[in-house]
């Protein structure tokens, strides 16, 4: 990021790391460095398919169903070897959830695998939460391929649905499972999600100590990240793992060094306190970092975050444009930047129809002060 980009790194909601500011001139050098480190595939088509989000600590968590490593390795191999899958649309994703202390119930994927203690997976498709196929750990790659190929056949040409939920909405999940030759049974999709209180700071996983730290809105200065990694190595850490909560986990520390790692992360500007206000807000880089951004949204997002109630989970989405890259999921309140101000969308996404248009930053703050208590109070089921 320092040598080939602009020194800025982004942590995404898909547990990916983005190197920003790469140019046509620096891209070849970046590719060479990433290949040397074993971080990308030489074939761009294969790399594009590796959109897999898995539980970040399954091998250390005694509450997890089992270690996902062998199954996910088989899944990656199938994605790499089956050339038919290269027709899948961009952003087609697979989630593999080991349950445990850091479950992925709030992370959506086109195909979702949930592990059980008996060594099997329940395979769900987006748009259907009450029906699933079942497969063993060694069958996860084959099951994912069958469901993905069924999606391609039923979706048809470029005019067809580009995401699984849209296909299920049109054709029904039963038709998709039948096309994939997958037997199904009633099963409820898990909505258990990890609390940031179980992610940030120092936590024991059996005999292992793990330190979690987050980046404000997922943005990291590469120099600070490098300093953090060097400190973790000095303290004897054995891994740094990305998570889908725009945070990372450092493992392999003893109790004294874990506390030192927490202090070092905080001193370097990373978030270790789960009550930090900006954790309640999703915000993209906005202008000028992104060409699509209409405003400097993170400045506003940081200011507005102090007006939100304490708690766990994202309440507010501030987007630089209607694409809504920082948060694809609906949010209690979304402010989408425009040339004239901000559009407000309630219980929706950045590109949805707004309830109010072209609000100034001051008007947004006034709205949050007067209506926030109502909007951000959890709705009780009737």
Regions found by a protein language model. Give the residues of each.
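Small-residue-enriched alpha-helical segments and adjacent helix-cap loops
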Residues: 1-124, 129, 134-138, 142, ...
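Flexible, glycine/charged-enriched surface loops at secondary-structure junctions
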Residues: 8-11, 85-89, 152-175, 182-196, ...
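Generic structural signal of hydrophobic/aromatic residues within well-ordered alpha-helices
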Residues: 30, 75, 164, 173-180, ...
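Generic surface-pattern signal
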Residues: 57, 80, 152, 169, ...
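Mobile "lid/hinge" segments at catalytic clefts and subdomain interfaces of large enzymes
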Residues: 92-170, 329, 334-382
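Gly/Thr-rich phosphate-binding loop signature of adenosyl cofactor/nucleotide-binding cores
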Residues: 181-230, 234, 271
């Amino acid at each position: 990021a320092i040598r080939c980009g602009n020194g800025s790194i982004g942590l995404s909601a898909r547990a990916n790391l983005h190197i920003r500011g790469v140019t046509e001139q620096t891209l070849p050098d970046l590719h060479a460095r990433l290949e040397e480190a074993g971080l990308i595939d030489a074939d761009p088509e294969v790399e594009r398919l590796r959109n897999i989000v898995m539980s970040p600590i399954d091998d250390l968590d005694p509450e997890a169903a089992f270690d996902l490593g062998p199954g996910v390795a088989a899944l990656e191999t199938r994605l790499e070897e089956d050339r038919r899958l290269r027709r899948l649309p961009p952003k087609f994703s697979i989630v593999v959830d080991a349950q445990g202390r850091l479950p992925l119930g709030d992370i959506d994927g086109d195909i979702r695998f949930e592990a059980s203690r008996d060594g099997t997976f329940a395979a769900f498709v987006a748009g259907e939460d009450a029906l699933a196929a079942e497969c063993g750990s060694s069958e996860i790659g084959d099951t994912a391929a069958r469901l993905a190929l069924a999606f391609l056949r039923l979706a048809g040409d470029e005019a067809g649905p580009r995401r699984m939920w849209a296909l299920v909405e049109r054709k029904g999940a039963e038709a998709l499972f039948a096309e994939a030759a997958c037997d199904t049974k009633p099963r409820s999709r898990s909505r258990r999600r990890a609390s940031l209180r179980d992610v940030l700071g120092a936590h024991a996983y059996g005999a292992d100590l793990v330190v979690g730290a987050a980046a404000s809105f997922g943005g990291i200065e590469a120099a600070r990240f490098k300093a953090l990694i060097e400190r973790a190595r000095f303290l004897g850490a054995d891994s740094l793992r990305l998570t889908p909560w725009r945070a990372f986990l450092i493992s392999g520390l003893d109790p004294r060094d874990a506390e030192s790692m927490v202090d070092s992360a905080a001193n370097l500007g990373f978030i270790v306190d789960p009550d930090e206000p900006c954790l309640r807000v999703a915000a993209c880089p906005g202008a000028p970092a992104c060409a699509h951004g209409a405003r400097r949204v993170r400045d506003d997002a940081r200011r507005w975050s102090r007006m939100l109630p304490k708690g766990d989970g994202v309440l507010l989405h501030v987007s630089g444009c209607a694409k809504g890259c920082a948060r694809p999921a609906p949010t209690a309140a979304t402010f989408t930047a425009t040339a004239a101000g901000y559009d407000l969308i309630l219980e929706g996404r950045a590109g949805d129809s707004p309830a109010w248009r072209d609000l100034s930053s001051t008007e947004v703050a006034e709205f949050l002060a007067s209506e926030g208590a109502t909007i951000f109070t959890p709705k009780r089921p009737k």
